[in-house]
Every structure is written in C-alpha cells, then in structure tokens.
Amino acid sequence: CLSEDGRLAVEPDGCRDVKFLLAKQGSEGVHLGDKVGFLITHRGNRHSDHRAAVVEKFGSSDYASECAKAILYGRNVRLEFPPEVLEEARAYDNATIDQAEAAHRMDLRAIPIFTIDSAETKDIDDAISLQKLENGGYELGVHIADVSHYVRPGSALDNEAYERATSIYYADKVIPMLPTQLSNGICSLNPQEDRFAFSCLMRLDEQGNILGYNFVKSVIRSRVKGVYKEINALLESMAAETTEPVEADEAAGPIDPEMLNALK
C-alpha cells in the first residue's frame, strides 16, 4: 500500500505505473507499506479513477515472510489440505513398509545407498548408489521413492497431488505436495528406514560408458542423508588429496564410511 493524494492506494506487484485507490470499508488496520490482496471494484478511464477493495491482509512489506505470503496468495497456492485428503493420509501415520510386498521386490538394502539434498529437505524422493563390480566396471543405481504404491489413481491424495504438482520451498518453509505422513514419512527416503522405490540399475565400464540397464521395483535403505555442502567439501578434499577430516553438517549427521568408499 502507498499514499496517493492523501489516500491509501495499492500498486500491483510488477506493475508500478498502475495504482488503485482503496475503498475505506475493509481497509481498517491497513498501513503504508503493507502487502494486501485486493479486488478491482471499478476501472475508470484514467488511473486515478480506478478503485479496489482489500480482501486479504498480510503485513508489512519490510518482512520477507509477509511478502512470501502475498506471493503465494497471488499465485493461488493451496496452503491447506482438504479434509478428505487428510483422512486418507491418516492411514499412514507412523507407517512402515508391507513385508509381504517387500518379498516381491528386489532387495537392495545391503548396498550402500545415500541421498544428497539440502540440509532443510524433508521430502527426500531420490537416492543413489555406486558399486565396483567383481568383473570390472561399476553399477550405478538411481532410486526414486515409489509414491504410487501409496497414492492410488483417482484417490483424494492423487487428485490433490495432481493439482499441486510439486512441493514448494520458500525462505525457511515448505508447502508439501502430499501430507507429511507421506511426504516426510513413508514416501521419504529417510536414512536408516526401509522404503519402497523404483530403481534404475546401470552397468558402466571403467570410463563411465553405459553398457546396459534395467528397471526394478525395489526395497531400499538409505545409509545417510548427505547434504550439498558436505559432499562438495568431501569432493574438494579428495581432489586436493588432503587427509584433513571433513566436518559433516550437523543437520545431516556423521559422514557414513560406506559413502566415502563409494566416492573414492
């Protein structure tokens, strides 16, 4: 909000040449510099004739959190889950994998699998593995969380995920695509937890050329949650052939020895 001829007016984000005078009704408690959502109530022949009404109040534009709320509002981001979605999600409170289903999948829990994300990431949806093969070359694994095992086509969860399309990370917060029982729980490849995944196992030669690959439904167990800063420091120290220890990010925990071996 800004002042226009002594009256409160709004200036749309990204459109500095257009201003709408605010109706007094509904503008109570709104101050200069506030972020608001507004509805155009009248379009005049001149900019000074435009009128608008406040429909949502956020707070001072001096605060990033209030600006973020306004941006999300302006893009119609869904902040809350509908009751029917939350009801379906409650079935996965503290869920663990179905052992009968696990018996029909390729068991990859014995190999060193790890994830690399930001320290703040909660919904961990992909992991990697790398092993030297006895007959030479390597097996590179890319493992994607098998969300489709839990989110069935046509369900309330499926419809909501379709509408949201992705989790949204902004500032120090996240708006998940799925309720936390799934996004942070049974569908997240958390360390030291058995999880269902789709895995692509690629056979590479010594030069990294792909010799073959296959896709499998799998059950995996991530050994460690790696973070970008930690992995970069590790790779830089290896490139410099230094023996100085690399400090792990506190949010990720200690660096797993098996992950170190995979990167050597």
Language model: regions and residue ranges:
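Charge-lined substrate channels and their catalytic hotspots, especially those that engage the 3′ end
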Residues: 1-141, 148-193, 232, 239-249
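Short beta-strand segments
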Residues: 143-145, 203
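Conserved catalytic alpha/beta cores of large enzymes that bind or transform nucleotide phosphates
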Residues: 168-264
